Amino acid sequence: MITNKDLKRCSQQVFTYSAQYQAPFYGREKSIIEMQDKTASLKPGEVLMISQPLGTGKTFLVNHMISEEKINVPRNSNFLTAKGVDENPDLMNQFPGDILIVDEVDIKTTYKKLTGGMSNLQEYLNKSEKKAIVIGDFSLKDPKLNDCLHNQQMLTEFEQLDREFLRGVLKQRFEYFMPNYLDVDFCLEDVIDAELINYLSPEWMKTVNSFRGVFSLLQSVVNSDKYVRFNNDKAYLEISMFKEYLADDDSLDLDEEVQYEFLNVLREYLRSEFPKGAGITSGFTVDELYQLAQMGEIDTEYDDFADEILYPLAVSDLLVSTGIPTYDEDDGQFIRRPAPFVPSLKLLLSVY
């Protein structure tokens, strides 16, 4: 039996979402097969692109392929980054092997460094005739950035974080990190309410749902003594704990009253029209959300609405962008989190 004390002691490992702990690899059989085939057939100067949302396991997949010797790159190699390749192109000369791995081609990097890094990569490939694997978010689908790389192909198979995938990963994590605490007939529902698992992996969110988002939320609740006390009671995570935690969360990075006003309107709308997220099939456009703001008598102009209200909500992990980040030539801005938007798990659980 896993106690609260046991779970708190092991929460960083069981719910890890970074390279701090070496978690076992799970699933992604289709991704592995396609990636192995495409990597093996890469010709000099060609690039394999992996374009998926942040925190979904792209780098983890590549590291797994390297550790299994399915990619000809030495283990524990430090991957290049878009920023690093932009600022110091000579780093590419130092990367071991004939396949460069360039990571973090995503919204954490400025657009100028993204395009600069990819242009430098293409120039290097032209001269060296080496190959490359480029790892990034949907920024890689931006036409201007995409055009920086000439001979490219995209990894099309990348298993999404649906309910079955999440259950499999969680069960494996408990068995790997806490084997001495498990009963012989252990099942995941012994520790986590099935309804909570369902809530953390809605079908309509699987294209943008991330391990980082799910596991960081699980860590936060388990680490809080208010919801999981450091005692020998049987550990059991219920959806009510997460609802209360998010209702009490004071970490929202909102600094304008109008942002809170719209958040309240949005919460009521989701609660009444999409209880527990049921009925959501796609993201909301700026027009749809602005219409909701008008119905709620929110004082904001359409031209300011996205920048002043929607973007801060996305940064605060209340809305999740499903669009393609792009550079607005007229405004000179990198639009990192464009519409359509779907409610985040954080937002959904707060209106449960």
Q: What spans do the regions from the language model cover?
A:
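Short amphipathic alpha-helical interaction segments
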Residues: 298-316
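Walker A/P-loop nucleotide-binding motif
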Residues: 44-63
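The conserved phosphate-sensing helix
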Residues: 204-222
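Conserved Walker B catalytic segment
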Residues: 92-149
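Conserved small helical "lid"/interfacial subdomain of P-loop NTPases
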Residues: 156-197
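Short, amphipathic alpha-helical interaction segments positioned at domain boundaries
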Residues: 334-352
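Winged-helix-like regulatory helical subdomains adjacent to P-loop NTPase cores
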Residues: 218-296
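A short, basic N-terminal segment
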Residues: 1-45
